[in-house]
Structures are given as structure tokens and as C-alpha cells.
Amino acid sequence: MIKIIDRTLSCLDNFSIDADSLKKLMLLLLKLNCDKLEISEKVYQAIKPLPPKEKFILRVHDICDLEKYPEFKEFVCESVHIDGDRRICKEFQMNSVGEMDQLGARTTTERIRLSGLDDILLSDYTNIFKKLKNVLKGPIEFCPMNRMKCATAIAMEWAFASDNAEIVTSFGSLNHYVPLEELIMALYMHHCPTNHSECRYFAKIRDLIENATHVPFAKHKAVIGKEIFQVESGIHVDGIMKNSLCYEPYNPELVGQKREIILGKKSGRASLTLKMKQLHLKLSELLLPQILQQVKELSIEKNDCVSDQEFIQIVNDVTRMNSIGAFTAKVREG
């Protein structure tokens, strides 16, 4: 059994985001069916009251603040010096595998959130996992960091090595935690129990966070990047038309995106054929070489792809010039 605790709503305190956007984000995150959502005190004050019958965890900076929030049953805190309170999950950071020896002296609560361990894949991680479970007798919320861009792989290894894994994520790897969208898709691709219909909200969540924080995600970021389903190469387009699994492990629609054929210097006849079909353009295949040549020349001149409007203009120009040429030839023959 794999449980996901998402902390996206506790990663936004450094941004000035209006309450309406925060509420919309919360509702979209709830649609992803995570087991729990972590929320910061600042965000909670902006969007309260929370929906009933949902599982929220409140992140507090001081253990003394717990009594201010009787409506919460679970808390997470980095500075805990009290033992025996089952409401509290103590989070502590292990920046490297070399800090394993300090583990025993720092476990003072029954539930532990372990963050960090970016470099664990460089070591014998299976034995390290066993040691962690032997030292930490209680439940472990595992929160590998993503500074080395392999947190999803670490989380998946932990999940497969545990009977009841609890993994902490953030959407888009905010604050360098396990990317929620990558973990959900990894579980889906490995046929783990998950509701794939939740994935269609990824693009909406991405757009909402980008608009609210004014910080865009990388265009080629796994799962949610805006350009990951853009295809320019003629060979790739031809392969996708025959069998999309040649280049795409899943359909773009599954994650709320669409495949887009990009015309440029790497395009081929297959690209033009599919683009004309998408734009409902009809013309003789004899004109494709001329059109393709102009597409490549324009792309090189712009140092960018050719837009649909520019492509339509090229098609119209080539068609018109060939019509004029054909008419002139007939006149000469006459």
C-alpha cells in the first residue's frame, strides 16, 4: 500500500497569492486523490474553513501553536522537543547518507518525516532502507529531495521496498521535493493501484501555479512541461502516426495535454501531411516538396518554428504561384 502526502500548499508562503487562487489550487489537488494534504499556517488562514471530511496536515513552526488549531488532528513540525504526542510528526533533514550515524539521537517522536538523502542512489540504498526501518521503529514519512533530479526514482525504490510506504511530494517539485505528478505517473506506468483519471488535472494545476507565482515550470519538464508533446522531426511524426507508443509512453490526453506537430527545419513530408489534415487543407502532393523547402527556409531564417498562420500563408503562396505558372503555360501553348 502506497500513501501520498502532498505538501504543495505548504510550499507557497514566499509568494503573494490571492485567496481565490489558493482555494482553486486546493480543490484541484483534492481531485488528485492524495491521502493527505499538508498546508501551512499562512495558507490556512487565507482559505479557511477547509472542506469537511478531507485529510489535512497543518505545518507549524512552533510546537506551542498546536492549541491554536483544535480543528486539526495532525501536525508536522521541524522543532519538536516533546515525545508521546501522536498528533505530531517530527521532520528532520539528512543532507547525505553520511549523516546516518546521527539518526538514533534525533528520533524523539513516534512518527518521523525523513527529508533529504539526495545521494542515496550512489550507495547501497537497499541496505540503507533496511537500516532506516530498523532504527526508526514507528511510521516513516519518506521525503527524498530532488536537487539531483532523481527523487522520483528514490521514492519508487522506497515504495517497492516497503509494505506501507508513505511518500511526501510537491507538485512540480516545488521546494525540491518529489514531483507529485511524476510519482503518480510512475505508479500508473508500473500498474500500481491508482486512479489514472486524476492525471488529467495536471495541466490545470501547472497553469494555476504558474499564473499565481509568476514562475514558469521548465517547458520540457517531465509529465507537465508545455512542450514535451511537441514533435518536429519528420521521422518522429511518421512513427507517431503509425504507433504513438514508439515515442510516447502514454497519451498526452491522459495528463491533460495535447500532441502538437511543430513545423521547422527538421520537418518532413509526414509532418506536412499531418499538419494539413489538422488545418483541413487540401492540395496536390506534387506541391509538398516546394512547401517543405519554404518551411525549412523560414524556420532557419527565424531560428524558430513556423506558426500555423505562416504555414497557411506558405501553402497559399505556393498554390497561387503554381496556378499562375500553369495558366501561363497554357497561354503559351495556345
Where does each model-flagged region fall?
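Terminal or standalone catalytic/regulatory effector modules within metabolic enzymes
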Residues: 1, 6, 28-64, 252-334
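Active-site pocket-lining/capping segments in soluble small-molecule metabolic enzymes
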Residues: 3-6, 58-63, 81-82, 92-95, ...
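Catalytic alpha/beta core domains of metabolic enzymes, predominantly
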Residues: 117-241, 245
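Active-site beta->alpha loop and helix N-cap motifs at the rims of alpha/beta catalytic domains
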Residues: 23, 31-123
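N-terminal small/glycine-rich loop or linker at the start of catalytic domains
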Residues: 1-17, 131-138
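General structural feature for long, well-ordered alpha-helical segments within catalytic domains
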Residues: 21-25, 124-128, 151-154, 179, ...
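Hydrophobic alpha-helical scaffolding
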Residues: 15, 148, 173, 195, ...
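Surface-exposed amphipathic alpha-helices with a cationic face
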Residues: 27-30, 47-53, 70, 84-86, ...
